[in-house]
Amino acid sequence: MEGKRRYDTGQFFNFARNSYLERTSRPVYAIVFLLPFIIFYEVGTILINTDVLNQSQVRVVAFVWLQHLLEYLGGGSRLAWVAPPLVVVIILIGLQVASGKQWHFSPEDFLPMAIECTLLAVPLIVLSLFLNSPAEPQGDIGRFADSAARIRNEVVPRCFLVEANSLSLAAVELGHRMAAGKSLLADIVTGLGAGIYEELVFRLILICLLMLFFQDVLRLTRRNSLILSVLISAALFSAHHHVVFVEGHFGRTAAFNWTEFGFRTIAGVYFAILFAIRGFAITAGTHAFYDIIATILNAAFFQY
């Protein structure tokens, strides 16, 4: 029993001790593997926005939620800006300590992890192309300009929402862009941020809280608790791209569409299953790599 407890990997599954799958499911791997993503997001956000600390920038919604929570708990606005990355690291350190797993990590595993994340992003790319055929483009899946604006032809929906006129799933524009044109760098930066902070909120935190509620409060079976937690977290993940709660107010970020909602829900289920099997590092990495691939595909082939 002790061995099983100490080497229980991912969120709900076991792998052979010290195998690649077991090692890369450890929280310490998530810290080291995702640290460059976090740094790139923080630095990139500053570079692509003016007046960073005065709220005139594009940010990932989940990042904003963490900021506001920290401000509510007594942190200043400047501290709230730098604190969310520390929250990610602290949570993962806590999980690493609680898991009782080895702290050792092998740098040789990081390239295979990046390749794995890229390959795991492919099914979502294929699904998005299937649902948004270029023959009959459905336009933006994540955001709209004003009601009179024409939807552009972008085929591959990204997992973030950054400006008023492009495909995305998870970040929202707060303020105005520095330029009217779309920034490829900005979309890559926000995609990386969405991969980390949305997976933190909707998978690592929300699924665990839902599991506790269904198992410990409602006394449901583990199987039923897991199914309900995955479905609810996926639905909320999808819904928050249509209606978000920011700065004490609800706001609509995109008109509701069943195809859009369905794709995001499927993506949420996919990420939840991936989280249950492979842990936070691979899930967040897959989310981020999907956003990057989708951004590049849209920019290279589908925008005009």
Where are these regions (language model features)?
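Alpha-helical transmembrane segments of multi-pass membrane proteins
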Residues: 34-55, 128-133
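Perimembrane loop-to-helix junctions flanking transmembrane segments
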Residues: 53-73, 174-179
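Transmembrane helix-loop-helix hairpins at the membrane interface
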Residues: 184-304
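N-terminal juxtamembrane cytosolic/stromal segments of multi-pass membrane proteins
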Residues: 1-28, 56-59
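Interfacial transmembrane-helix boundary/kink motif in multi-pass membrane proteins
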Residues: 18-34, 68-79, 101-123, 222
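Transmembrane alpha-helical segments in integral membrane proteins
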Residues: 84-103, 200-217
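Alpha-helical transmembrane segments of polytopic membrane proteins
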Residues: 74-87, 256-263
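Juxtamembrane helix-loop-helix connectors linking adjacent transmembrane helices
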Residues: 98-194, 211-220
